[in-house]
Curated annotation (Swiss-Prot):
Residues 563-578, 619-647 have a biased composition (Polar residues). It comes from Gallus gallus (Chicken). Pfam families: zf-C2H2, zf-C2H2_15. This is Zinc finger protein GLI2. A zinc finger (C2H2-type) spans 234-259, 267-294, 300-324, 330-355, 361-386. PANTHER family: TRANSCRIPTIONAL ACTIVATOR CUBITUS INTERRUPTUS (PTHR45718), ZINC FINGER PROTEIN GLI2 (PTHR45718:SF6). Keywords: Activator, Cell projection, Cilium, Cytoplasm, Developmental protein, DNA-binding, Metal-binding, Nucleus, Repeat, Repressor, Transcription, Transcription regulation, Zinc, Zinc-finger. SMART domains: ZnF_C2H2. It is found in: Nucleus; Cytoplasm; Cell projection, Cilium. Residues 386-402 have a biased composition (Basic and acidic residues).
Amino acid sequence: LMAGHPNYGDILMQSGGAAGTAHLHEYLSPVDVSRFSSPRVTPRLSRKRALSISPLSDASIDLQTMIRTSPNSLVAYINNSRSSSAASGSYGHLSAGTISPAFSFPHPINPVTYQQILTQQRGLSSAFGHTPPLIQPSPTFPPRQHMAVISVNPPPAQISSNSNCISDSSQSKQSSESAVSSTVNPVINKRTKVKTEVEGLPQYPQPRQEHLTDLKEDLDKDECKQEPEVIYETNCHWEGCTKEYDTQEQLVHHINNDHIHGEKKEFVCRWQDCTREQKPFKAQYMLVVHMRRHTGEKPHKCTFEGCSKAYSRLENLKTHLRSHTGEKPYVCEHEGCNKAFSNASDRAKHQNRTHSNEKPYVCKIPGCTKRYTDPSSLRKHVKTVHGPDAHVTKKQRNDVHPRPPPLKENGDNEASAKQSSKVSEESPEANSTTRSMEDCLQVKTIKTENSVMCQSSPGGQSSCSSEPSPLGSTNNNDSGVEMNMHGGGSLGDLTGWMTRLPVVDSTVSSGNLTVSLQLRKHMTTMQRLEQLKKEKLKTVKDSCSWVNPAPQGRNTKLPPISGNGSILENSGGSSRTLPNPRIMELSVNEVTMLNQINERRDSTTSTISSAYTVSRRSSGISPYFSSRRSSEASQLGHRPNNTSSADSYDPISTGGREFDIKL
């Protein structure tokens, strides 16, 4: 519409008085215009753009409103910047109070010049058929601070509809902010509307603060999970005690001195309504820590400045301190994952959730099928759903149901528990075997454990065989020496031959050399002995290499079998001396027993049993006074390669009839 008209600046400079032209030229010259921070240097550098307003009919176009709201109005050209009017919210027309200091006139306009400018504006109004906005002189007082508001350009229809809606509060507010009020009411309304919209913008710092609060809660959720609710108890509720105190410290001192340290033998909590139900603790310090649940004592306080956290358990304080130091000692054990955590519970939770779908922690409450990836979630579930009284301890877990797949750190404990259960299952067999042997032997002192410890002999070979002995499958297992040890050396392996044993046994404790001998009066006949000799003599060559510590060849001579039934004679017949000093601990009665054994070798009714009554010993007691696996007398060497006691010997068998003990 106005594209064909010449610029306002050209018209003002061509038609006007000398004074007015001089003053206008001062403001419109390129030198003065360069004072403003506008991208356009002179008015001639850019042509006036055609107005682009929302689609309206020609009859309804209000040129005055269009010019006032247009950013390309005359005043905008004089200021040479559309941003100045837009930033101040004046939408193209000048309001002296809204002009920022950067875009104000360099010096105030005197009244004479102001009247000349008004005259020029009236001449322009006759040419265009409307009255342009009046130019207000700039204020003489120092310019106020520039108010930053968001530029909003609503359509003109909205401006006209809101032009008459001005409240008293908004007018008073604008009058206090602006030194020179605007001549147009929609201007004040628009400024108020812009400020209202600015104030009504969504507040972003609030969600940010909530997010920080969530992070803080996540940081402290694990360190407080085992801490009970805040309790401050000053009265003693111990069983039979009703003392009252003023402070918590006095109550704690009373409990520790009078109740806990007073009962040194058993560590039981006798507090009223305690969910532990007087189950004893293993140590005193555990009871001291437990009592903090009742008293509310939290002696472990955070040492960082400004932090008032306190905990009843030292472990929880250490975990909390990592939130200050940033320490994360628990690294994910999965290959390729370098994530670290401040506590083990978070690491277990991460590993089970991220690297596997395993939920090994099962709720033990009957009827509940909940499973969790970490122990802290299970404890929280039990406490919140089933109540604090439903807490399941480690000891109770073994009694109710088989435990879930254990953690890695508990694997060794589980294995040891299983092994001990196996030993307990084998012990009844050993007990039954011992009962079946009561007609053959009587034991005075038993200090041995269920399993016999296998120790190495001086030759480097074990004195207890870990291989299955073929003696268990023979028909005549009447030896008093052969003892097959499987792994742990259970006594149940002796069942095959001890029930038919016509010998006198000796029991040797692991710490003491105690020999208790009771000879059986009723022995088997010589015929049975001769039969055993014939059956066992065939393999004795391969099992006699242990007589001397030095290795011997296969041409070792067998001891001769005498006609009187004694098979314990050595071919040399020379007496041997016991080099072990622990043999000095034998009592006089035991020496007498040994003499009786030597006398029974001449008897035709004696058996081979008496020769080995003191020889069944572990090599840990004496390497020279140990049991023979395949003796020359019993000759139970069905194994060609017997690995038992290859470097030890029996002083009874090697000494022959003239067995001497040098004291």
